[in-house]
């Protein structure tokens, strides 16, 4: 089960959401654990868990009936990581891992080794008309000064400032059970 709770602070220009992934995330992990390729390394599991939570938060914060896909492509050991969220809080997440991964690797190490990483957020309407293309915004995995971003939350905040011109604070936390 996934849970989503929204809140506001009266008299302040602040609103927020909390998402909690439990059984649904465990199902994603158990499917991968039982696959021929075996479990993801811990940094990949962590990244995908954060991506799943972030995609659900973003999908639920906009008035949109369709899928929101958060995709990271890069030149590190993870070539591609994708999380897709639906309005009913269902989601899926996967990654294409091409090389060994250090247990302490950060986002920059995983997907942005040589500074070529990109983040794409795609909105795919459920009632898309023939010929209509999904909306997609793409930003580099680097700050304005070229510094490689180390955390997914930094990357999404950067995306929201660059692509949506929206000041955003995102806190992602994992609790391993």
What are these regions (language model features)?
Residues 1-173:
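General detector of N-terminal leader/presequence modules that precede the first folded domain
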Residues 175-177:
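Conserved small/polar residues in nucleotide/adenosyl-binding loops
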């Amino acid at each position: 089960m996934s849970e989503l709770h929204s809140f506001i602070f009266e008299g302040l220009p602040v609103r927020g959401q909390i998402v909690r992934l439990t059984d649904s995330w465990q199902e994603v992990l158990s499917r991968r654990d039982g696959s021929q390729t075996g479990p993801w390394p811990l940094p990949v599991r962590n990244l995908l868990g954060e991506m799943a939570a972030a995609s659900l938060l973003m999908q639920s914060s906009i008035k949109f009936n369709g899928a929101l896909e958060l995709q990271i492509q890069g030149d590190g050991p993870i070539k591609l990581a994708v999380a897709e969220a639906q309005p009913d809080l269902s989601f899926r997440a996967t990654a294409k891992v091409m090389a060994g991964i250090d247990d302490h690797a950060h986002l920059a190490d995983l997907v942005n080794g040589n500074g070529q990483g990109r983040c794409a957020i795609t909105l795919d309407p459920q009632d898309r008309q023939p010929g209509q293309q999904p909306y997609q915004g793409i930003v580099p995995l680097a700050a304005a000064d070229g510094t490689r971003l180390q955390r997914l939350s930094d990357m999404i905040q950067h995306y929201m400032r660059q692509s949506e011109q929206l000041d955003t604070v995102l806190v992602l936390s994992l609790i391993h059970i």
